[in-house]
Amino acid sequence: MAKHVVVIGGGVGGIATAYNLRNLMPDLKITLISDRPYFGFTPAFPHLAMGWRKFEDISVPLAPLLPKFNIEFINEKAESIDPDANTVTTQSGKKIEYDYLVIATGPKLVFGAEGQEENSTSICTAEHALETQKKLQELYANPGPVVIGAIPGVSCFGPAYEFALMLHYELKKRGIRYKVPMTFITSEPYLGHFGVGGIGASKRLVEDLFAERNIDWIANVAVKAIEPDKVIYEDLNGNTHEVPAKFTMFMPSFQGPEVVASAGDKVANPANKMVIVNRCFQNPTYKNIFGVGVVTAIPPIEKTPIPTGVPKTGMMIEQMAMAVAHNIVNDIRNNPDKYAPRLSAICIADFGEDAGFFFADPVIPPRERVITKMGKWAHYFKTAFEKYFLWKVRNGNIAPSFEEKVLEIFLKVHPIELCKDCEGAPGSRC
């Protein structure tokens, strides 16, 4: 009888894991559970907020797609996990038994600053991005000060930088940039830290970009409150300061959703309810449970004065998904080989008229290679990659062999590595 793998989550991590499993093992029973009926291309959510993309341009409906690849799709919220009984219970009360479980839910958003959820905007979901788009129309009609940034505990800083620079470009195009003072406030110890201690010359590059575009910045502070007309932050000396604001966009922090917490403290990290995994992204206690994506508990790479987390970018998530799929299939086939993701990353930050290209191998130091470049070519590269990735989703193969070969030739990157000892922190070398 075929083994049954249940994947919770229909984002990059869930889709990539399901497709990798299907391509590695055609007779495997796979069920994907997601409360969203679509796959959304997260890196394009800033563009959706700016009105540069339509929702249908960057999303793919899952119900007609997944059955084509013999993957059952359940469009419901997963309510709870019983790791001892090997079951997932959905919102309707349906109990689904599994042999292996992959948790790729994505995070629960935590709007930790007072008034953040009510008075600010976000670009972390398609729905939030569309709401932000409406708020921007109000700003264009009645310009005033803009404040963008990240609250304490954030691990995903890139979109905030991208959004600030894209908004500068849009305001300039509309001829109203001179009416909009812009300030960037972040919990990072310095600009371009990104939660990973910087990537090459990222500090200098981002500081130069902001200086050239007249965007003021305040780093190493904790945003405490966001009110309709101002942002209140606290410095390291405990002093509070205010910055006037007509429009704000602040990245929230992340924690694991309730379904992860329901599995208990051996699956959910008590501190943040993220999935506890080892180097091979397997839960150390329940060996048939794996984590993929933002919901995995990767420890911070360094202690910062204001708490920051480690980002999990698209390329990192694809590598997690590939490693997990190989590990599940090898376990089914009684093959002792285990794999860990390399956790290297290509990040392209779109600035509107040009873009920044960042490559870190691996993301978690010490690194073997780092590349930071900037130019109009990177802007077009990101647009092309968006279309390419959505093509991969529609065609049931997130990891085509030619892509792996291209990365190996040009960047000397191998997405996964054979791991003789999985019992270590995720991201640590085997």
Swiss-Prot record:
GO terms for cellular component: membrane. A quinone binds at I346. Its cofactor is FAD. It is a peripheral membrane protein. Binds 1 FAD per subunit. GO terms for biological process: aerobic electron transport chain. It is an enzyme of class 1 (oxidoreductase). The active site is at C156 (cysteine persulfide intermediate), C347 (cysteine persulfide intermediate). Pfam families: Pyr_redox_2. This is Sulfide-quinone reductase. The gene is sqr.
